[in-house]
């Protein structure tokens, strides 16, 4: 992989309790420990990746990013793990499908956010891995993750 390439991995399964969040946190921490810059996107309205990394309620969340009310740059929060950041989730994600309705491009909102992220980062601080912690369902949030991902775990 080119040092400047950003790899996007979605952690998805329709069943809850199978280890998506645990894998996202542990894989993100391991990648950061070997020098990679990692961003976790918490797409699960339960927000367990966010709370698991010690992030409580923040000004902006993935809901705000996906609805266009905040940029991914503004919503990104540093964690206690060096080189590991997260865009935290809130329960507001439950209303995402209703919020976007039948708007065009609704399946590609997350993918478009990553283009914005790459455009605003300098080479020495470029995110090398994005891990998307998906909700336990095949809904519009998960479809956004799958459309944005290079690979799925």
Question: Residue locations for each model-derived region?
Answer:
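P-loop NTP-binding core
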Residues: 1-153
């Amino acid at each position: 992989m080119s040092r400047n390439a950003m790899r996007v991995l979605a952690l998805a399964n329709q069943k809850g309790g199978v280890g998506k969040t645990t894998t996202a946190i542990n894989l993100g921490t391991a990648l950061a420990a070997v020098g990679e810059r990692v961003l976790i996107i918490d797409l699960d309205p339960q927000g367990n990746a966010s709370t698991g990394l010690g992030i409580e309620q923040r000004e902006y969340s993935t809901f705000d990013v996906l609805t266009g009310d905040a940029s991914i740059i503004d919503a990104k929060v540093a964690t206690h793990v060096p080189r590991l950041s997260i865009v935290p989730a809130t329960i507001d994600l439950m209303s995402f499908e209703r919020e976007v309705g039948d708007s065009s491009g609704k399946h590609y909102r997350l993918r478009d956010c990553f283009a914005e992220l790459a455009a605003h980062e300098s080479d020495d601080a470029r995110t090398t891995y994005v891990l998307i912690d998906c909700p336990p369902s095949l809904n519009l949030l998960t479809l956004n993750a799958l459309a944005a991902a290079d690979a799925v775990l």
